[in-house]
UniProtKB/Swiss-Prot annotation:
Site (Lowers pKa of active site Tyr): 79
SUPFAM superfamilies, per database record: NAD(P)-linked oxidoreductase
GO cellular component, one term: extracellular region
Spans through the membrane: none
Source species of the chain: Aspergillus oryzae (strain ATCC 42149 / RIB 40) (Yellow koji mold)
Protein name: Probable NAD(P)H-dependent D-xylose reductase xyl1
């Protein structure tokens, strides 16, 4: 089952449902990507920081070799890590990531965080994480404008078909749009019923920037990381509002949460290593929730953010 697409301001079509690669184990990653392609997934959302791009590429290569899919039918996403924000670092690290994936271009290349950290040589440590070689967080003087100018050159050189941002506020987006020669095609943010960020979503969409939600299931992804507010928060899958809608429509709680996003034009990137759930997560566009039901889910908003760099040792708040 193929996912419907959203037209980006770059002119390219992006699947509304993709497969997220954060925390996908290196040992199983190639097989998971391969199986996801067989199940019908075409968008794969990766990143330098996930540390599994080589294995992702192996799964893609196997599927292409077996004739299951062509490269041009895939939508491969990766991200620029914080340690490579200086203008002359952007293209070299993008080329390394392309080589890791075994592809010639990214369909979408995203600035992962609006934070410039001190450069870490990939030969010394890769992925570099948040700390410098000294073992502590150190900042670079690179500006977002410097970084974005280098990102635009990736489009010029056909290394990336579209470029975007992640974890940006409306203020940062507004500033970026004042000087961008190539407008960001997408904004990827944490988005679930406990963190709806309606004004940010509305602003991005009004500016023609597609929104992608990560962590669509709220605290679930952060339990194994022992993030305190995730551990202390009731699971969305067990919330009465979500459960009752799942029963009404004969869907899973996961499908209800994903449909709440996709019905509002927001792309999603769930993952699963379970074949049944893989298929179920793709089936989130052919049926509709009522307007009042969308609003009921949105009313669960608590402003609860689970992916905050403060928890990774960052001492300057970005949200």
């Amino acid at each position: 089952m193929a996912s419907p697409t959203v037209k980006l301001n770059s002119g390219h079509d992006m699947p509304l449902v993709g497969f997220g690669l954060w925390k996908v184990n290196n040992e199983t990653c190639a097989d998971q990507v391969y199986e996801a392609i067989k199940a019908g997934y075409r968008l794969f959302d990766g990143a330098c920081d996930y540390g599994n791009e080589v294995e992702c590429g192996q799964g893609v290569a196997r599927a292409i070799k077996e004739g299951i899919v062509k490269r041009e039918e895939l939508f491969i996403v990766s991200k620029l890590w914080n340690s490579f924000h200086e203008g002359d670092r952007v293209e070299p690290i993008c080329r390394k990531q392309l080589a890791d994936w075994g592809v010639d271009y990214f369909d979408l290349y995203i600035v992962h965080f609006p934070v410039a950290l001190k450069y870490v040589d990939p030969a010394v440590r890769y992925p570099p994480g948040w700390n410098s070689e000294s073992g502590k967080i150190e900042f670079s003087n690179a500006t977002i404008q410097e970084t974005w100018t280098a990102m635009e050159s990736l489009v010029d050189k056909k290394l990336a078909r579209s470029i975007g941002v992640s974890n940006f506020s409306a203020q940062l987006l507004m500033d970026l749009l004042r000087y961008a020669r190539v407008r960001p095609a997408t904004l990827q943010i944490e988005h679930h019923p406990y963190l709806t960020q309606p004004r940010l979503v509305e602003y991005a969409q009004k500016e023609g920037i597609a929104v992608t939600a990560y962590s669509s299931f709220g605290p679930l992804s952060f339990l194994e990381l022992e993030v305190k507010n995730a551990v202390d928060t009731p699971p969305l899958f067990e919330h009465n509002t979500i459960k009752s809608l799942a029963e009404k429509y004969g869907k899973t709680p996961a499908q209800v949460l994903l449909r709440w996003a996709t019905q509002r034009g927001i792309a999603v990137i769930p993952k699963s290593n379970n074949p049944t759930r893989l298929s179920q997560n793709l089936e989130v566009t052919g049926w509709d929730l009522e307007k009042s039901e969308l609003e009921a889910i949105s009313s669960l908003d608590k402003g609860l953010r689970f992916n905050d760099p403060i928890g990774y040792g960052m001492y300057v708040p970005i949200f």
